[in-house]
Amino acid sequence: MSHIYSVDEIKAIVAPIAAAHDVDGIYLFGSYARGNATEKSDIDLRVDKGRLTDLFALGALYADLEEGLNKKLDLLTTGSLDQKFLQQISKEEITLYEHATT
């Protein structure tokens, strides 16, 4: 049986991984953000890449997130998204991590 996470549980797992990979932000959208996730739901995340400059670094982030959450992920980068789709998901997004600026 697969676990249905709360947003707080997802944030607790994702935030330290995001910080370790030095991304600018990670945001939850989709069924988990809307509160209607089921056991079969994947976790939809949008990432502002920050210092992730290549596919290997992005792949490492994905692997760490998937291992930490033990769930299938859709990890989308902000730069790869169509503006219309970005506007659509921004209505439901929940911030899981944002890099603190000094």
Task: For the regions a language model picked out, list residue spans one by one.
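Catalytic core of pol beta-like nucleotidyltransferases
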Residues: 1-25, 34-39, 50-102
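Acidic Asp/Glu-based divalent-cation binding sites
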Residues: 42-44
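Short hydrophobic/aromatic beta-strand micro-patches
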Residues: 46-48
